[in-house]
Amino acid sequence: LTPGLNGDGTMAERGIPASIVSKYLDDRGVIVEKTGPYNLLFLFSFGIDNTKAMGLLRELCNFRRDYDRNLEIKEAIPSLYKKDPSFYDGMRLQELAQGIHKLIVEHDLPNMMFHAFETLPKMVMPPFEAFQRELNGEVEEVRIQDMQDKVNANMILPYPPGVPLVMPGEMLTADNRAVLD
């Protein structure tokens, strides 16, 4: 876990969103399998040796050092800086972390994620039928934010991790709108 979410589920005043740590590690060749708001998942195979495990630990310690030194994004996460140099120019690691943490707090992301699947999407037709309708041109393109009360012809599949949120033939309603949000 990274700082930001207290043990009782309340939000901390300051935080280090896991997405920043994940991006930092990615720039150093460490693969994070899953990133949540304040958690990271690493998978190790049975044949992993101490060198790889210690490499992960070393890079996590390097992140902590660079965070404490408050490096500029240009130096700490070069790939992120390259995506929008004018935005990240002069920005430092702690500023980025607190900015993202503030957005997570404002939008109550952990609570929203916790409740996202309390009510599952409604199955209106089998996936095969939804696919056939797409093949026959009987579907329309709809922006994702306008998907409520419409039957999906395709999966809504964020990647990573590549797990479908909504399957073809399912419909999101007001009860499960949090899936889209």
Describe the predicted segments one by one.
Residues 1-181:
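Non-catalytic terminal extensions of PLP-dependent enzymes
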